Amino acid sequence: MKRQRNVNLLLMLVLLVAVGQMAQTIYIPAIADMARDLNVREGAVQSVMGAYLLTYGVSQLFYGPISDRVGRRPVILVGMSIFMLATLVAVTTSSLTVLIAASAMQGMGTGVGGVMARTLPRDLYERTQLRHANSLLNMGILVSPLLAPLIGGLLDTMWNWRACYLFLLVLCAGVTFSMARWMPETRPVDAPRTRLLTSYKTLFGNSGFNCYLLMLIGGLAGIAAFEACSGVLMGAVLGLSSMTVSILFILPIPAAFFGAWFAGRPNKRFSTLMWQSVICCLLAGLLMWIPDWFGVMNVWTLLVPAALFFFGAGMLFPLATSGAMEPFPFLAGTAGALVGGLQNIGSGVLASLSAMLPQTGQGSLGLLMTLMGLLIVLCWLPLATRMSHQGQPV
C-alpha cells in the first residue's frame, strides 16, 4: 500500500513540475502571433522567458527552507495558487509589460515544483531506491519539453496564443485539486526546526554537497548553452527554416530521457554510472568544439555532440541529485532549493554569456560545453577518490 502511495505521489509530482516546464516553452510557436497581437517586435517577446526563468530560479531559494518549517503541502498549494492568478492575468492582458510581469509571477509560483522535484523523493526514499525514484522522475519530467511546443503550436493554430495560457490554467487547476485532495504531508515528523542561515551553513559546509551542486549546475548550464546557441547557428548560419529548426531543436531530448533510464538501473554501481556520465559530458563538449578548429559546421556536428551531452546530463541529474540530497533528510527542502535555484540561475548566466560570444560557428558553443564538462569532471574526482576509500554512499 505504501509503495503504491509513493508511486502515485511521484506521478502527481511529474504533473506538478510539468506545469512549470510547459509554461516556459508552450508559447514559443506562437511568438510571431503574440508580437503581432501585442504590437511589438518578435525579439521583445523573448523577455517573457527571461522574466520567468529568473523568478523560477530565485523563488526556489525561499520555497525550500519554508517547506522544511511548515511542510510540503501548504507551500505547494500557495505556489500553484500564485501561478493560476498570474496565468489569469496573462490570458486577459493586451500589454507586453503586463505579460512580462505575469510571466515573472508565474515563475514565482512554479518555483515550488522545482524544489519539490528534489525534496519529495528524499522524503519517500533512501539510497538505491532514491536513485531509482529520481531516475523515473526525470524520465517523466523530460516528456513535457517534447509535448509543450507541439501543444502550443496546435492551440495557436486552432485558436490563438491566449489558448496556450488557458491550457496552462486548466492543467494547473487540475494538478492543484489533485494534490489538495490526495497528497499527504511528507515532511519528516521529527524534523527539527532550524534557522535558514544555519541550514545554509550546514549545506555549504559539506564539501560533497558543494561538489554535487557544481556538477548539476554544469550539466544544466551546458544544456542551456546549446539551447541558447542552436537556434542562431541552425537558423541564421546554416539557413534552415524555422519549422526545421524546431524539429531539430528537440531531437537531443530523447537522449536525456534514455540517460535518466540508464542511470536508474538498480544492478549498477553508483560510482560506475557517475564515471560514465561525466566522461560523456566532457567528450561531448570536445566533439562540439573540435569541428570548429577545421572550419566545419553542419547539422550532424551540432546534434551528435548535443545528444551525447544530453545523455550524460540525463544520467547526471538523478545521480548527482541523489548524492547531494542523501545526507540531509531533515534539510531536504533547503537542499532541494539550493540545487534547483542555483542550477537555474547558473544556466541563465551561461546562456546570457553565450549571447555575448561570436555566433558565426560552433566554436563558442563547443568551448562553453567543454568548460562545463571539465567542471563536472573536476568536481567528481574528489568524490570518486573518497568513495574508493569509504564505499558506496548511495
From Swiss-Prot:
InterPro entries: MFS (IPR011701), MFS_dom (IPR020846), MFS_trans_sf (IPR036259), Multidrug-R (IPR004734). It holds the Pfam family MFS_1. It is found in: Cell inner membrane. GO terms for biological process: xenobiotic detoxification by transmembrane export across the plasma membrane. Residues 1-8, 68-73, 117-134, 184-212, 264-276, 320-329, 386-394 are cytoplasmic. Residues 30-46, 95, 156-162, 234-242, 298, 351-364 are periplasmic. GO terms for cellular component: plasma membrane. One of its GO terms (molecular function) is transmembrane transporter activity. It is a multi-pass membrane protein. Its main location: membrane. NCBIfam families: 2_A_01_02, PRK11652.1. Multidrug resistance pump that participates in a low energy shock adaptive response. This is Multidrug resistance protein D. The lineage of its organism: Bacteria, Pseudomonadati, Pseudomonadota, Gammaproteobacteria, Enterobacterales.
